[in-house]
Amino acid sequence: MVLASFLVSGLVLGLLAQKMRPVQSKGVDLGLCDETRFECKCGDPGYVFNIPVKQCTYFYRWRPYCKPCDDLEAKDICPKYKRCQECKAGLDSCVTCPPNKYGTWCSGECQCKNGGICDQRTGACACRDRYEGVHCEILKGCPLLPSDSQVQEVRNPPDNPQTIDYSCSPGFKLKGMARISCLPNGQWSNFPPKCIRECAMVSSPEHGKVNALSGDMIEGATLRFSCDSPYYLIGQETLTCQGNGQWNGQIPQCKNLVFCPDLDPVNHAEHKVKIGVEQKYGQFPQGTEVTYTCSGNYFLMGFDTLKCNPDGSWSGSQPSCVKVADREVDCDSKAVDFLDDVGEPVRIHCPAGCSLTAGTVWGTAIYHELSSVCRAAIHAGKLPNSGGAVHVVNNGPYSDFLGSDLNGIKSEELKSLARSFRFDYVRSSTAGKSGCPDGWFEVDENCVYVTSKQRAWERAQGVCTNMAARLAVLDKDVIPNSLTETLRGKGLTTTWIGLHRLDAEKPFIWELMDRSNVVLNDNLTFWASGEPGNETNCVYMDIQDQLQSVWKTKSCFQPSSFACMMDLSDRNKAKCDDPGSLENGHATLHGQSIDGFYAGSSIRYSCEVLHYLSGTETVTCTTNGTWSAPKPRCIKVITCQNPPVPSYGSVEIKPPSRTNSISRVGSPFLRLPRLPLPLARAAKPPPKPRSSQPSTVDLASKVKLPEGHYRVGSRAIYTCESRYYELLGSQGRRCDSNGNWSGRPASCIPVCGRSDSPRSPFIWNGNSTEIGQWPWQAGISRWLADHNMWFLQCGGSLLNEKWIVTAAHCVTYSATAEIIDPNQFKMYLGKYYRDDSRDDDYVQVREALEIHVNPNYDPGNLNFDIALIQLKTPVTLTTRVQPICLPTDITTREHLKEGTLAVVTGWGLNENNTYSETIQQAVLPVVAASTCEEGYKEADLPLTVTENMFCAGYKKGRYDACSGDSGGPLVFADDSRTERRWVLEGIVSWGSPSGCGKANQYGGFTKVNVFLSWIRQFI
């Protein structure tokens, strides 16, 4: 039996294996596998319990294994148990559900209301007493209604009343139904009533009547008032009884009224009118209050509230709204920092003493925007030197600023288009009994201005300064109640204070911001914005607490309302007159009030550069209103400025000699008077008594001179940098008492035409030279691009450190007047050998900066054959490099005579028809123009020697300038001086087409004297 079962089982397994080939089989319940269990969670968060799961047999590659039938997994079964409150293994449903849930798996939401109980299987609601309906939503009977605290009610029956009876406490009247009933539809027959307090009856006003418009004096009852003629009703015409038992207003009065005149509109201001009587009686009856508020960036000047007095007058003058600069103004401030839109005035306040300080002003009446604004106001006559407030007005573009000398200030003229400004007067404000300006409050001997405008700390300080005040500053760390009450009265809760905290981690160190009168003590120090820790935190006063005010700090850049303060005590001090400006001097003011010079203030004077002070340095305003000393003077120190230093020279300044006596160099003896000795002694003047005051000379000698200024008597000694220059003018000059240097200006000019070579050039039949024998000789090389080389093609003559003269045909393209690019030329000075490789360190090579050819140059006949080359960098004069002398009319007349000998030099072709390797020279006699023309005519080469040319050479030829010598010098010896000099009379220009050194065919030279005026245009 077992075997049969095994065989059957094997057969079945084999058949199943064949059927489920090739890889994996489907599960079959063969009864061979035990149950497994899934762990599921009951409820959320709930608990874990096990659920039995049946397993089936599966095959994989002919091998059986067990797993849950139908590939069932825990995720397929467990989720539905999470909604249960209690679960049971094997039960295909929840045992119990959470509150307000129902159904097999607790998926339904119970809808029961008013405490109804939900059936967990069906969701049906079991209602409590007094409720019915599917969801227990219907209340049996009528709902209870709320009632006022003063209403008394009786319910019948108490638990589920069908009627309610109402009544009121004593002193109240019932308004509404005394009984309401519950209707079949579940609604009450009426609203609950109210208990209303009765208002007291009012008697008629004096000179008037009152009428009640209803019987009961309860809420809504109205009284109407009227006055007998000629009285006006002041207050409400009707009063209504309110629910609280009070009338809705004050009982009116009957008065005989007066009216105030109409008010003009105030620019940039809004106003609110509070009228004590009805508008029908007139615009501004007595008791009317008009309150002004300035818009935008405008500040109120004057009283913010005007009241119509019983006598028909206003309590004060109308205020104005003006823009106030939010930067502090000093004597150096420029108007550009304060200008607003065109035509818009801005109030500033200038300190005292600005006429005593420096600062440029351009214009008269209308000024340039870069002018010193306070000095301009004094110049315009809008302010005295003692300072004060003024309105600066943007005048728009302007271009004709006129200079003038007005009110002790000299303005400059300027003819350029720029923004301009002018001034308007500031209306003077009246002061009350306290001495404070209109709209200011007296607080502990101070005048306080309060504004709700918001500004950063520094900007707020600027506004206060331009109101002739400062940010409110206290001399102790206790806030006075009077200030707190004033600020609260203006509706402020926080306000900047002119105190500053150095370090948030340390106790407060209070700092006074008044920079004109700094008092240093333990509790009060001066603030400097550059100190560490001062950059961000500023002090403000928090007055929100009704019981006390406290100091706090916040960022200085955060806007806040603020209060300005001025000291009343200054107004009781003696005041000194304005001392006026100090010519050529400055003044530093100490302790002055912002609007003048009071007792105790002082002025310290100083002079401008090159001036000294004569008189008392510091003057003080005394208690009797006078200055302690006269104003000093600034006296100019006479000096000479730096004398001009000549090019290629130097000047040495020597101080004045210590004695005032004059000694004559070379005097053999001193002359003495022919008197007896006693008489001679008596002839001396008695000694002068010494003064305790320093003399003018002593004061002037103590003044420190700026660089470039020298005292009277100083000496300037001139020298040239080398022997290659000679000094023209005065070698020594002295600073005289007029501030001028004596003598003639000195200059160093190159020594021209001097050769250091001892060799005589006039060696007949010779052509050799020495190195440096002709130091003005210049070699001119041109870049030959086709040959990739520099070629020495012409000569030239050095005129000074920067200029060389040569022939025009050397620097122009062949047969044209077109100038070759200067970059294609190099100039050599001090050169001896043609070959550049043989040049030594004394040869100076320069590039051309500019080339100038005579504008009349004719390349056809070489007339006007002259050109100038400017060097990029000047040469240094040495033994080998020196300039040649230019001719004069006298030298030209002497030298250009027939037969006069001259020397021509260059690197041109020699008799072997090769270019010379060294500088060659030739001595040539001058030939008459007619002889020259005749010689060429005989050779059938007719030409004309113009007045700009001359000829030189020999009848038989022998020596001549040749190709390569063009542009070089033809010089003549000038022995009219002690030392021989050489003069440039000619420039090698042209020769015979047949060749060099031909008989009767002389060399042509450009006559330099003709072109002296043209040359001097450049050098």
Swiss-Prot record:
Domain LCCL residues, every copy: 325-421
Disulfide bridges in this chain: 106-118, 112-125, 127-136, 142-182, 168-195, 199-241, 227-254, 260-308, 294-321, 331-350, 354-374, 436-447, 464-564, 538-556, 576-621, 607-634, 720-748, 794-810, 932-951, 962-996
Signal peptide: 1-25
Keyword Secreted (UniProt): yes
PROSITE patterns per record: C_TYPE_LECTIN_2, EGF_1, EGF_3, LCCL, SUSHI, TRYPSIN_DOM, TRYPSIN_HIS, TRYPSIN_SER
Binding site for substrate: 960
Keyword entries, A-Z: Cell adhesion, Disulfide bond, EGF-like domain, Glycoprotein, Hemolymph clotting, Hydrolase, Lectin, Protease, Repeat, Secreted, Serine protease, Signal, Sushi
Swiss-Prot/TrEMBL GO biological process terms: cell adhesion; hemolymph coagulation; proteolysis
Domain spans labelled C-type lectin: 436-568
Active site: 809 (charge relay system), 865 (charge relay system), 966 (charge relay system)
Limits of the EGF-like domain: 102-137
Known glycosylation sites: 523, 534, 624, 740, 767, 912
Annotated Sushi domain residues: 140-197, 198-256, 258-323, 574-636, 689-750
Domain Peptidase S1, first and last residues per copy: 763-1019
Enzyme nomenclature, EC number: 3.4.21.84
Activity regulation, free text: Activated by Gram-negative bacterial lipopolysaccharides and chymotrypsin.
Top-level EC class as recorded in UniProt: hydrolase
GO molecular function: carbohydrate binding; serine-type endopeptidase activity
InterPro entries, per the entry: C-type_lectin-like, C-type_lectin-like/link_sf, CTDL_fold, EGF-like_dom, LCCL, LCCL_sf, LE_dom, Peptidase_S1_PA
Cellular localization per UniProt: Secreted
Gene Ontology cellular component terms for the protein in this record: extracellular region
Family: Belongs to the peptidase S1 family.
Oligomeric form and interacting partners: Heterodimer of a light chain and a heavy chain linked by a disulfide bond.
Function of the molecule: This enzyme is closely associated with an endotoxin-sensitive hemolymph coagulation system which may play important roles in both hemostasis and host defense mechanisms. Its active form catalyzes the activation of factor B.
Listed name of the protein: Limulus clotting factor C
